[in-house]
Amino acid sequence: MSSEKEAALRRLDDSPTIFDKIIKKEIPSTVVYEDEKVLAFRDINPQAPTHILIIPKVKDGLTGLAKAEERHIEILGYLLYVAKVVAKQEGLEDGYRVVINDGPSGCQSVYHIHVHLLGGRQMNWPPG
């Protein structure tokens, strides 16, 4: 089993995450967008010249995409809309990639749903 998957398996519960601390401003982050529903900030380990994480401010049991329920439809759509807004703000007119890693095999590292916005270079396919 890969070390990434082992690390993910240790964090499967709904306990507070580093993102909760970022939302509460208990630890620093480079915020690029914020409103009453979401927070977007630069990834501390970027995988592209532009790598931004977009998270809902209220987790509401939405630790990952597999946990989504009908009540989460609005926030899931809003996360994608904000990805578009931030991409434009970041000057990614030529294109960008939006990623949601889900679960241990999907290499999800923080169990608070989040969207990765990647751009600023040519994205390759397949991704991984």
Swiss-Prot record:
Stretches assigned to the HIT domain = 18-128
GO CC terms in record? cytoplasm
- What residue ranges carry the coiled-coil annotation? none
| Gene Ontology MF term list | adenylylsulfatase activity
Annotated SUPFAM superfamilies? HIT-like (SSF54197)
Motif Histidine triad motif, per the record, lies over 112-116
Instruction: List the InterPro entries.
Output: Histidine_triad_CS, Histidine_triad_HIT, HIT-like, HIT-like_sf
Mind listing the GO biological process terms from this record? purine ribonucleotide metabolic process; sulfur compound metabolic process
User: Could you describe the subunit structure of this protein?
Assistant: Homodimer.
The protein's name is: 14 kDa zinc-binding protein
The record lists the organism as Zea mays (Maize)
The uppermost taxa in this organism's lineage are: Eukaryota, Viridiplantae, Streptophyta, Embryophyta, Tracheophyta
